[in-house]
Amino acid sequence: MTRERPIRRVGIHEWGTHPVPPEHLRALLDDRDDLDCAFEVCSTDEAAEYDGVVTLFHHDEFLDGVEWVHNIRSGYEDFPLDDYRDGDVVMTNSTGVAGDLVAESVTGLVLTLAKGLHRFRDQQHEREWDRLSWERPFEVGQSSACVVGLGELGGSTASRLGVLGMDVDGVDIRPVSGLGLGRVYDPAQIENAVSDARFVVLTTPLNEATRGLVDGSVFEAMREDAYLINVSRGEIVVEGDLVEALENDEIAGAALDVFYDEPLPEDAPFWEMENVVVTPHAAAQADTYGDRIADLVATNVDRLTHGGTPWNRVV
């Protein structure tokens, strides 16, 4: 047990509409009959008036009297954790919410790249009826993948790809068993890990060890018919090296949900590349995202109020 932190008012910070509108999340929480807590959408300047704040991003105002901050993402690289500790502010994140959702998106991207579905969509807009060359589409169940990062996102992704019949290896700093994996490599062995994979899927969190992890040497180690899928963070890839690998046909293509700069600038080369699928950091989007966040927030309001340990405590 930890000390009780009565959470009676929670501000849902105004962050826009994605991945779930704040007003929708407030309505979901208001429908809970098991909580003695008021939920209100709040601005940054109003945050200090609340016992807890639910947010997408950190703001320094959260450190001025707030007992608890909940991050609706799993990633927290932009949160100053030492400041939270120094201020005795509990910080929790949303690990466990997005794993299945991202895995579904990765599955869709794998099938899109394998079958060339993005090409057909492009042709539809031009009213063109044209099949791909006979050898271009390939059978996913006879191919292989390497999932880099086997935490929440990677574990769910590896399991889903295994269901498709793929041979799946992984890369992680920890020894990981189960998940239908073949071999699990240490990050120092990433070039060996990706060398036989038709798909290299990036699901690792961003930190100092993973920033720039996937560079030109990794692309050189990949098969020429391999595809990169990135649903983690753009900074994990050395973007200039990826552009060069795509332009020089060192790899077959990519599906990219995350980038160095977001929104992706209009002059970014990826927009014009026929062998690249661009999605707007949307891999975790689903109509149930808000319900999952509401359940987690409600659980932590109850736990903090009664002296329990909150789920997904980071600080």
Predicted features, each with a name:
Residues 163-180:
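NAD(P)-binding Rossmann-fold cofactor-contacting core
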Residues 89, 95-144, 309-314:
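Phosphate-binding beta-alpha-beta segment of Rossmann-like dinucleotide-binding domains, i.e.
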Residues 154-155, 215:
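N-terminal Rossmann-fold NAD(P) dinucleotide-binding loop
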Residues 175-269:
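Rossmann-like adenosine-cofactor binding region
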Residues 148-151:
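Glycine-rich Rossmann-fold phosphate-binding loop(s) that bind the pyrophosphate
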Residues 1-90:
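An N-terminal-biased, well-structured beta-alpha scaffold segment characteristic
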Residues 7, 141-145, 216, 225:
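Phosphate-coordination loops involved in phosphoryl transfer and adenosine-cofactor binding
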Residues 92-93, 97-105, 119, 262-315:
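C-terminal helix-to-coil terminal segments
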